Amino acid sequence: MKRTAFFISDGTGITAEALGQSLLAQFEFIEFEKITLPYIDSLEKARKAVARIDKASEIDGNKPVIFDTIVNSEIRAEIRKSQGYMIDIFGTFLEPLEQELGSKSTYTVGKSHSIVSNSSYNRRIDAMNYALENDDGARVRYYNEADIILVGVSRSGKTPTCIYLALQYGIKAANFPLTEDDILDQRLPESLRSYREKIFGLTIDPERLAVIRNERKPNSKYASIKQCNYEVEEVELMYRRERIPYLNSTDYSVEEISTRIMMMTGIERHIR
């Protein structure tokens, strides 16, 4: 089944996307075409958005799902005229919150993002630069600055997790790929041993690893199920021998991997 989902906002659309994506992810047997419409901050833009929604409804034969974070009530009312099923995020939550707090909302466009301090922004950028500069074992001499060092076989999810930890939490995360020689030795590489307390391992089901590697190097030894089985078995054995905490990333999104790592290690987020 195919449905269209619109994320509509009078700002960047990040909040509508974040909540909408989380809800849609619960319906794994439905294919969603996702469309973000940011800065819908006038009635004219709202009418154009309605036209797109109605066209999608006609093509799909189903109502598009609309997630909106529009502050202006007139613009929201205009969007509501469309042939879509509208989930009004601010309207749903602000009114009961106003009643509970005994205070009216200021209804400020883009407020959720304007409150981020300069220090948080700088921390996020520093962590992101660190993740990129210390990707794939490139610069181990800066590992003393790391909050965490992810290790694992090639294509087990290290890089996207490091980037997410940096962007979302301001965590400085480096990653180091464990080669066939490393896992054959069954010891941490020499360059990592002085940072043992920062090391966290990722693993992955061999079948999933083979699929991912075949996208990169199809029909190669590197992507064969035999090679993937071997590397995963050996790296998990090394984790246990070296007493390295680790997580199987197969069934988790990068958001879930990051959250579980923080829970397992006790690392605190640096930005909020």
UniProtKB/Swiss-Prot annotation:
Residues involved in ADP binding: G152, V153, S154, R155, S156, G157, K158, T159
Catalytic activity: [pyruvate, water dikinase] + ADP = [pyruvate, water dikinase]-phosphate + AMP + H(+); [pyruvate, water dikinase]-phosphate + phosphate + H(+) = [pyruvate, water dikinase] + diphosphate
Domain of life: Bacteria
Range of residues in the leader sequence: none
Pfam families in the record: Kinase-PPPase
Keyword Nucleotide-binding: yes
Family statement: Belongs to the pyruvate, phosphate/water dikinase regulatory protein family. PSRP subfamily.
Chain's role: Bifunctional serine/threonine kinase and phosphorylase involved in the regulation of the phosphoenolpyruvate synthase (PEPS) by catalyzing its phosphorylation/dephosphorylation.
Name of this chain's protein: Putative phosphoenolpyruvate synthase regulatory protein
Record lineage: Bacteria, Pseudomonadati, Pseudomonadota, Gammaproteobacteria, Oceanospirillales
